[in-house]
Amino acid sequence: APTNITYGHNNRSAQFRLPQNRYCIENRAADMTMNVYLALSMTISAAVEGIEKKIHPGKPTDQDLYNMTESEFKKLGIKRLPKNLLMAIEALKNDKLSDEVLGPVMKKSLLAYKNDEWERYHQAVTDWEVKEYLRLY
């Protein structure tokens, strides 16, 4: 899955892919665990905001992003998507567009649910932890 905020034409490593042989936009960062209604409403709202405010998306990125270094990302001005759920929660908290699109009640509820999910995730013991620490102790 893409890890950077980018778009490209036939680039499967970009967050948004605009295939040149079809009239469509693929959101490659979305996954099957998302709420499709919230994801679609935020994606469309962000697109509309970009059009209305004439926000230039930058140049398309058509090189393989999976093989680029951090310094190459910085040189091209490419930002990272959140690396984990906690970082995503913080990004959502600070996002002004989501205030408008989701409204205060939905946003507060979503943040509470995702914070609870993060806490439950950290209470689980993973297979890696069992294997790693049982061999040491």
Residue ranges and their predicted role:
Residues A1-Y137:
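Catalytic-core signal marking the mid-to-C-terminal active-site face
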